[in-house]
């Protein structure tokens, strides 16, 4: 249906705008009503978009003709009239209609006579005034063919099943669910719940690539003692960035450096795209560090598309840069103070409120550019390029009256929904909400103002109570008692108390406790290393996980100080932080991925991906996690990587009835494996290993830890296409820690075979396969026996001897006979 609506918009956009003479006298005009239907034909019960109107455009985007109707004659000759409808300024509009009978419908637009009066400016800014009477008209009847069988729509494309990269073809619309962006370098709790939608978040520690952050040397200094280079904690945070359309942009230097630069890296490949100071004509803007990112969805009469920006700020001045090149685009001055909220089209909103005076205003980055523009907005890019805008002059969408003297301050905002404020003290909690949704009534209307009497223990114990977390998706807010380390929850649909106090946490959490609400669950972590998950609506403890320090490395407590860094795809990722760690850093700090439903460990790396307290923490986009590891101050990309399978079979034929050996290799061919360092260590390629072996294996491959002795390989399926054309699986094997696999098999028929070795993929690798071939011959044929005399040993030796003896006797006899004759 979205496609149909887009087609209607395109059709209406191409209609010419009326050219109005300046100060024209009242006149009249014949009209020519039209009607179209898409799709046509259509299946019964399927929705049709009717295109109705006249080919006359009006002068401003908010104007439209009114009272249009559609006369429908059904296949059974009954009629109905649908409408009335108002057109947009093009003179046309789209109407949804669902036929319920099989057969031919007849559709006809009726345009009623009406005046259109206009005083203002034409497209070029010239003053005009006109009065026009548009006369009544009927469109020709349109036949709509409704058939019994439904028509087919575009089938859509499946999500990727093999390694993918950017850019993503726009036709692969379904892929938006795995290609979200990350727009805030260091999310500020409790305003941001660390939630990252539209991701297939990693379920193993597989590393795609790594590179130095570029600030200083990292890791162990060496040559002096066991200490390492400074990591920016405390007060001089390193890293921090955003990810837009598969490109990671991060701050190269720590926050205290006078000269700053931003690095752009392809998140999928690790390729550096550019490094530069965010400046214009050599003049640096602000502190040169990325403040936040933006992806704006722009739509005008003649142009629709997304525009992305990297924002640098300095006080009330904002500077926009093009992510593709790092070039400056435009500035805004006099931006009001406040918290950034992203609107439905990616616009950045801020809310100004005066509770004493009783007013509320919404400021909008898009309105700074577009509001009160003469003519029509042709394209966003050309309107902002190279310009500076005063954000105070025309950046406000509206300013409305609200009840005076609302207590406390604004706590959370959901644009186009509501704004929630609260006052919290030792004796009372008062929560109120104002409407921001025009479909639910006047903007600024008070939705509720609810007071709750606090327990006496708050005042008696001089407890510090703060607003810990809130979610307008789950409609829950929680307060935290710092000293008692328990929660109190409130319903944000009405401000009423829900539950509390929760059982107290371990004592160290009074020094640092991080709370987030996502998927209907409140997750807490902190200095105590005790991660707990509660049902946000009821307070029921669902699970808890303790990040134990089994080797007594961490000097503050028995468990690792942990904080949530990402919540995405039903998982919560936590990393170890410390306010101002001693050197050498404690060894073995974990990075953990937990199933948010069960608390089960999805994967965990001990001694890798250590986080920072003052710099940029882990972020996720395109289903890949990007982070800086403070152990070596390198940037890592964590996600599913490509694999490569090879297979070999005997090159010479084998005899039917004999066995042959099929062998091959399965390797990791992620971008990080192509460096000289890894090529030197793994000349035959980096072996692909099992998910359960991945954390220790990645430490060995990329961090030079000892090679693990219990590494397991991956399953390989072997199949053949035999000489009869039959495809069949012949068995399975598992590769070893070197990536090598072997399989013996006895072919059962003669002829040529194609053999397939297939790796189905895992949470760490995309699938791969390879082919080879071999031939099976019949055994050699044995010839039939010939009738030949067989000579025995007797024949060979005795017979010749006898014959010789006989010959001698004959000779002797002859000699004797001659002698006897001679005597006579």
Which ranges hold each PLM region?
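Structural beta-strand segments of beta-rich domains
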Residues: 46-50, 658-662
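Short beta-strand segments of immunoglobulin-like
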Residues: 37-42, 649-654
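Enriched for extracellular/lumenal, surface-exposed ectodomains of secreted and cell-surface proteins
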Residues: 101, 105-132, 749-768
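Proline/serine/threonine-rich low-complexity linkers at boundaries of modular beta-sandwich domains
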Residues: 21-32, 636-644
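Residue-level recognition of secondary-structure-to-loop junctions
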Residues: 88, 94-101, 105, 111, ...
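Secretory targeting signatures
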Residues: 1-26, 52, 205, 326, ...
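Short flexible loop/turn segments that cap and initiate beta-strands
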Residues: 55-83, 204, 209, 672-729
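Repeat-blade elements of multi-bladed beta-propeller folds
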Residues: 161-162, 166-182, 186, 224-262, ...
